[in-house]
Amino acid sequence: MEAKLFVLFCTFTVLKADTICVGYHANNSTDTVDTVLEKNVTVTHSVNLLEDSHNGKLCSLNGIAPLQLGKCNVAGWLLGNPECDLLLTANSWSYIIETSNSENGTCYPGEFIDYEELREQLSSVSSFEKFEIFPKASSWPNHETTKGVTAACSYSGASSFYRNLLWITKKGTSYPKLSKSYTNNKGKEVLVLWGVHHPPTTSEQQSLYQNADAYVSVGSSKYNRRFTPEIAARPKVRGQAGRMNYYWTLLDQGDTITFEATGNLIAPWYAFALNKGSDSGIITSDAPVHNCDTRCQTPHGALNSSLPFQNVHPITIGECPKYVKSTKLRMATGLRNVPSIQSRGLFGAIAGFIEGGWTGMIDGWYGYHHQNEQGSGYAADQKSTQNAIDGITNKVNSVIEKMNTQFTAVGKEFNNLERRIEKLNKKVDDGFLDVWTYNAELLVLLENERTLDFHDSNVRNLYEKVKSQLRNNAKELGNGCFEFYHKCDDECMESVKNGTYDYPKYSEESKLNREEIDGVKLESMGVYQILAIYSTVASSLVLLVSLGAISFWMCSNGSLQCRICI
């Protein structure tokens, strides 16, 4: 009985022993990240690298408003379709917006030659100076400039024509050969547009131009073409059996362009001195234009984001994140948010020896929990926490900086004859997009694995730091905690935390308590062994007595007969 009471007393004493535990921060975060080995790992802190939202608006770009073409397209705007008169004064923009029903382009039917290339050129233009290249009143004294109108380009119910071109016809009964030149002195490239008319019949050719064998010649240092009218019967489009083909060229500073014709010339009236050098572009969008500002615009809406990736739209204008196909790119910065023991990454650094994170420790990532006669409490290890924060912050910033190549990505332009090239280009673009997406996802997976293992190793290092100080002055409990063999007040606890624990000071007390506890263990083991033997012997005796009594009873009533044979 004395041994039993002594064992119970020692057990009670052990439960009240001073302890210190190494642990890590936990919170109520539900953020999840993916690693190379796992998916949806809950972590205490993380940063999102993928922008997936927009405001649904078309905004000004860095304070400069876009040019909304409305129901007009680029051709109608530059040629001066009468339906696009609201755009006549437009001369600057951050980007150009066409809508899905931008149908007002060339009002007189015909082909706009190299139209897609012209749209591509506008991607680097943000403003222009519109000017009269050949003034209407003085440039064509021997020709008619007022009768060239058509019902196909009507305005307010009356026949009209393009605002930036002149349809030159015969004056009286003659169309003398014309020759007109312009030398570019604007200090920048000048966009010049003109056209060539192809009548449906020879009678219309003579009615308009008098000359049956007319030609149009256009030449500069880089451009030289001669056009002859193609007179042929054609089905009517917009009420017209004739056709007009539209042409353009860029005239360098100091270069001269000369127009020579004996008929069929749709002469330039206005030209455009282009201001190049900034990223612009043409997008097709039905989103509304609002009084807002952004650094990145997509057809779906504006992105106000400094993240390195986005999955909103591949077409972007401005300083935009790189488009990827991913649906999630989240980088871990904190630790696993672990409520219970589970596997911990490649290193397995604290697998099975830390039961779970502490929500009570809010001022650091790693730290201590102690309990002694003076009370208990949490304390973060500021040095290891700060080193980890600095390292991870630098890593995240480096990843974002390397991957955050912001740029404009506008769609490439192809005409109907280049569909095979367009399909090939799309395949190439899709291939690059797949590579970008794969690289981004792999980078995040690897960095997340490294970050979580980095945290694990930091907790392990903190544990080893405590263990190396305490040595045999404390017992490892196997859950990240140490039980002291001596009294450890708050000053003692603080010395363990800051690495100044005085091992010799507590060695003698620890030795005595350790030997006493070990002795109790041995004595209690002997008591329990004696009890076990006694119990076994007593049970055997009871069994034998019972068997003997049953045998005697059965012999007395004849149920059991015993015969002894010699």
From Swiss-Prot:
Q: Name one GO cellular component term.
A: viral envelope
Q: Where is the signal peptide?
A: 1-17
The residue spans the entry assigns to the Extracellular side of the membrane are as follows 18-529
Question: What are the protein's UniProt keywords?
Answer: Clathrin- and caveolin-independent endocytosis of virus by host, Clathrin-mediated endocytosis of virus by host, Disulfide bond, Fusion of virus membrane with host endosomal membrane, Fusion of virus membrane with host membrane, Glycoprotein, Hemagglutinin, Host cell membrane, Host membrane, Host-virus interaction, Lipoprotein, Membrane, Palmitate, Signal, Transmembrane, Transmembrane helix, Viral attachment to host cell, Viral envelope protein, Viral penetration into host cytoplasm, Virion, Virus endocytosis by host, Virus entry into host cell
Is the Transmembrane keyword given for this protein? yes
- Provide the record's note on post-translational modification: Palmitoylated.
GO terms in the biological process aspect are:
clathrin-dependent endocytosis of virus by host cell; fusion of virus membrane with host endosome membrane; fusion of virus membrane with host plasma membrane; viral budding from plasma membrane; virion attachment to host cell
In which family does this protein belong, per the annotation?
A: Belongs to the influenza viruses hemagglutinin family.
> Any idea what job this protein has?
Binds to sialic acid-containing receptors on the cell surface, bringing about the attachment of the virus particle to the cell. This attachment induces virion internalization either through clathrin-dependent endocytosis or through clathrin- and caveolin-independent pathway. Plays a major role in the determination of host range restriction and virulence. Class I viral fusion protein. Responsible for penetration of the virus into the cell cytoplasm by mediating the fusion of the membrane of the endocytosed virus particle with the endosomal membrane.
The protein depicted here goes by the name Hemagglutinin
Organism name: Influenza A virus (strain A/Turkey/Minnesota/1661/1981 H1N1)
* Gene (UniProt): HA
